[in-house]
């Protein structure tokens, strides 16, 4: 069975990110902190932070990263969270936190971020934590949480503007305009 692929352009991702920002603004939520999850969540987080600032909501913002690896003789993956110390040192229970990524897939990374924040922040964990992603895959979600803000639902394999891994040369040249010419300069 062939999995359908949805190719997302940089402009589409940017506009969807601004749309998310307007959704967040219209909901009345005013985050004190915005966290973009490296890699895909960072450009989305930047656009959301920019449009919220334009609309009068200044916020602190930072990127964090998650990684997965297989432990020795283990069948399950553990998700680790990196770069969260700034949040732990600066957030309070009264703050509002927005976690931003490009897609909500299984939810494992979000669960790891929330669990790490709870463990390390203890009483300082913000009481209002929300999530925003342009894309949501409800059938892949394995946790008891859904994003508060999203634009699209899909089961397709999403190919974001920066992604090349897992694509054939034919797919890259057909779906990533101008990349053939750029790659022709590789020595």
Q: What positions do the PLM features span?
A:
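PRPP-associated nucleotide enzymes
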Residues: 1-187
